[in-house]
């Protein structure tokens, strides 16, 4: 980890997640989730998750692609993605789903 990866003191850190990375066609990369716990300091987390309907296919937004920036992901079905992610997270019954598996 380099010093530019560390949040500023008192800053609010927002983990945008994989969906925004796909929507933005990699303009806004999702960071690796990692938390550092310090025994002598308080740490507050307020998770908020936005999930589309399971029938949703998400892909780079039209405003994020052009002739110089073609789509970097094929459409990702949310139900399929979440099922694969859950299998990797909880059941350990398969490959952990990553957006890189949908890269073009």
Give residue spans per PLM region.
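C-terminal flanking tails of non-heme Fe-dependent oxygenases
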Residues: 4-104
């Amino acid at each position: 980890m380099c010093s530019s990866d560390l949040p500023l003191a008192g800053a609010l850190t927002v983990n945008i997640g994989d969906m925004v990375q796909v929507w933005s066609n990699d303009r806004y990369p999702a960071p690796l989730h990692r938390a550092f716990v310090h025994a002598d300091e308080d740490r507050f987390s307020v998770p908020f998750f936005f999930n589309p309907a399971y029938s949703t296919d998400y892909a780079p937004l039209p405003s994020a692609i052009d002739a110089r920036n073609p789509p970097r992901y094929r459409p990702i079905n949310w139900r399929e993605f979440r099922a694969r992610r859950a299998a990797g997270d909880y059941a350990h019954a398969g490959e952990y789903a990553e957006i890189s598996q949908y890269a073009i």
